[in-house]
Amino acid sequence: TLKVYNMSILTDMFGSIAYREALKGGEGINTPHINSQQEVYTAMLEELELANSLYNASLGLDDPTKDGIYGGDIAKWQKFTNTLRLRLLMRVSGRNNAFTPTVGEQINQIISNPGKYPVFESNDDNATVKFSGSAEYYKTYFNSSSFPDDKSLSSDHHIAAQLLDLLYDASDGFVDPRLRIWIKPRYIQYPSATEPDVIREMIGAVSGCTINYNGITSISEREPYLHYETLVGDTRPNHMLDYDELLFIKAEAAMNGWISGSAKEYYEAAITASCQKWGEYGIYASYPELNASNKIELKTVAITQKNIAALLASDQVKWNNTQQRLAEQKWLSLFWVIGFQMYHEMRR
């Protein structure tokens, strides 16, 4: 399973790679044959089918503590395997007939037979790498050293306009509840108790351009930045593959007529799962809010069912039966999932 997971990132990034003869240096194969991307995908799907048949939930690991993803839970590894297979199938769904059985037929085969092909059922099944937060075990994918807060780092990681524009619209007051988990606005705190503090309006950075491209002359003015306390704290996990992505896959499969069920219901369940996943990070937040005296207080964040219902009913998010709306929200849900998944999803 992990071999396919890692090799899928390589082929999605670079196309043709060594696969069938790769990782065989011990057998004397030092110059492995390069396979086409279709050959790689065919082989990866075959290996995930094989892996599914090999997992035995009645057996455990001799030392479950060595498993930093599922703690030796074999049943969850099997769910991860089949959900990963669905990710890869949907990624090549534009070439439906290039595979035998077709992509749609394989997706239907998995989803319609949960007894043989169990998949993620909740956020409890998410594939994440956990970190203890001590010594070298705080160095996550996004965190090369211990960064407990945003001190001296807020100038480093600005939020792109493409992301911010899906989360925030000042013209009508739209704010995705996940924004306060992922992003912090610029703010000014004055020492005087009578002088009001200021929270800046948020304007996203234009990717690939200088900081003043959008008319801002100082990074301290309006460009928001990553919410370090929630995202790169020393014990925050790496997300590899999550339940919300599975639900988006089901929504797209339903739109394509490959599986039964309502695309709208799968879509709304996906966004709900994403919000619930990120809501758990709110206890680490340090988000600026103005109190009754117009002074800033840094607070934790909660995402309530009311917040989620309002999000699903908003003009920016509510289901409109289009691939664009589905693609935008799936792309957004892949924020902070490792392996360049937002990029791969956009390219497909």
List where the protein language model places each region.
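Structured, solvent-exposed acidic/aromatic patches
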Residues: T1-G282, N320-Q323, Q329
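C-terminal functional modules
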Residues: S274-R348
